[in-house]
């Protein structure tokens, strides 16, 4: 496999993953894993490890951008993160026992459906409505939801981004920017844990693919997060929906 082909595949995967992360708090695994598996014939477990590693910096720089614009709920984010992390390791170990084809397809389909939801039924919750929810109720919900997300995160190799965005907007009643900001904040840590456990169980991945994917995802996540924080809620819902639908269709088509 020539270095140029590796670079092109990883760069294009990084564009999709970065835009998905910066706009929607989507895990890079939903895009990077299927592309590496399909076009570079990479084993699924190795591809997921690279995708999670790409997630770490992309999510961190996105979380910083959202936090700087006061679109981040750190208190509940930490609560959810602890329960997510506890179950990421469990999911990752079980994933190592599962055949290649089972992994990835679930997250791709979910990406597409969530994109359609944002276009058809946008999240227009305001920060005032969001802050009116009882803190104790939100705490309990955050713990329960975190356990579910953590297991799925480790199992399908997603930083749980789509699950978190869906739960933060639909179950916990967050407005979209705060939901994405909180999602990428949590994902920074879940993806790091997932990547470390993947590399510990499966060994180090292809170094060049890792470097290319991390660099491209980081660049495009930064661009998307800066745009998202300046956009109006209606524009952001539409942009998020379109990005998710295009990525979902593109990856399903590639498979």
PLM feature spans:
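Membrane-embedded alpha-helical segments of transport systems
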Residues: 53-61, 86-87, 94, 185-193
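Juxtamembrane transmembrane-helix boundary motif
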Residues: 1-17, 27, 31-33, 37-39, ...
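Small-residue hotspots at the loop-to-helix junctions and early N-terminal turns
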Residues: 44-48, 180, 184
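ABC-type ATPase nucleotide-binding domains, specifically the catalytic core motifs of the NBD
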Residues: 173
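Hydrophobic/aromatic end-of-helix segments at the C-terminal termini of transmembrane alpha-helices
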Residues: 31-32, 160-164
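A small-residue-rich subset of transmembrane alpha-helices
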Residues: 54, 182-198, 208-220
